[in-house]
Amino acid sequence: QLSPMAQQTKETLGTKDLTVLADRGYFSGEEILKCEQAQIKALVPKPMTSNSTSSGRFDKRDFHYEAKRDRYRCPAGKYATRRCTSIQHGMTIHRYWSTACPQCPLRSACTTDTCRRINRWEHEDVVERMQRRIDGMPQAGRLRRQTVEHTFGTLKSWMGATHFLTRTLPRVRTEMSLQVLAYNLKRVMQILGVQPLI
C-alpha cells in the first residue's frame, strides 16, 4: 500500500527525490524495498512487537550484525552464525544461532529456550538503512504528526460519527476529495485571508 501511493506522489510532483513519512501501521519490509527500488526514501518506524523486550530480555537490536561474515554478535560477545534458510509468507528468511548459548551466563536475559534464534530477512539491510535515516532525523516524526494528525482529526470531526455519507469506492473517493478541498480552502483563507481569493 505504501509504495503505490509513494510512486504516484513522485509522478504527480514530477520529482526525482522523494522522502515519504508514514506511521508504524504502514511498516512492511517488502513495501520499503519497493520504495527504495523506485528511489524513494521511506521513513516508517518499525512496530515494537518483540516479546523479549516486554519480558525484559535482550531484543534483536541488542545483537550486532556483521555483514562481511554474515553473523550476529550477541551481548555476551559470542557469535550466532547462519544455520538455515526458509521461505515464510513469500519472504526468504535466514536463521542464526550460537552453540555457546546453553553455557552462556546471560542466557536467562536472552531467551527461555536452550538457544537464542535470530531471524533475518534477505533484504534486512534495506530496513536497517531506513532505520539509520530515521535515527538521523528525529524531528521527522514530530513534523509528520504536526502536519498530518491535525488534518485527519479535523476531517473526522467535520464528518461526524458516520464518516462517509455515500457508498461504493468511487463515491467515497469523491466525498473525501470534497472534504480535503474544503479543508485546504479553509486553511488558505486562514493564512491569506478571503480578499486574495476574490
What are these regions (language model features)?
Residues 1-198:
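Anion-binding and metal-coordination hotspots
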